[in-house]
């Protein structure tokens, strides 16, 4: 099993991009391994497929950005089905759980993610970031 010291969780949003850059700078400084994760959640197969396609685009861009910075970024794309419309906060918890599961699986030292996601309208810490910070067993760096 491959081990990554850094796991950067991104959705391609402004804050996600800040997290990507921060994670790559740390990776380059310490010459360590990094993986980028995108969690595609959908209640219908077509919706999930759309989000998986977006995730592939986002992760390909992250790999290109990493290459331009001299960092090799590995991609993790996770597709999750939700059978019905989730209640408030359920989607954030599902995304956070997928990030945390990947962190455990790959024995990650530090998770890096944006303070708000693409769907966040609250100026406070984003719901996914908050869930990850609360439940992570490893260090979490939140980019703002």
Regions found by a protein language model. Give the residues of each.
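Small/aliphatic-rich secondary-structure junction motif
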Residues: 1-53, 67-71, 75-76
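Charged docking surfaces used in two-component/phosphorelay signaling
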Residues: 78-98
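Active-site charged/polar residues at nucleotide-handling catalytic sites that mediate phosphoryl
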Residues: 30, 102, 106-107
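Short secondary-structure boundary segments
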Residues: 38, 114-116, 144
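Glycine-rich, Arg-bearing micro-motifs that act as flexible, cationic patches
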Residues: 110-131
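Short, structured coil segments at secondary-structure junctions
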Residues: 30, 128, 135-137
């Amino acid at each position: 099993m491959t081990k990554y010291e850094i796991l950067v969780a991104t959705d391609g949003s402004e804050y996600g991009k800040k997290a990507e850059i921060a994670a790559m700078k740390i990776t380059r400084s310490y010459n360590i391994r990094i993986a980028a994760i995108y969690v595609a959640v959908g209640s219908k197969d077509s919706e999930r497929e759309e989000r998986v396609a977006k995730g592939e685009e986002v992760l390909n861009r992250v790999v290109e950005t990493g290459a331009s910075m001299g960092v090799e970024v590995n991609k993790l794309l996770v597709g999750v089905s939700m059978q019905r419309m989730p209640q408030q906060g359920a989607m954030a918890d599902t995304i956070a759980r997928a990030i945390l599961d990947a962190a455990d699986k790959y024995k990650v030292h530090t998770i890096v993610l944006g303070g708000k996601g693409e769907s966040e309208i609250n100026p406070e810490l984003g719901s996914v970031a908050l869930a990850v910070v609360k439940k992570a067993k490893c260090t979490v760096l939140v980019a703002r």
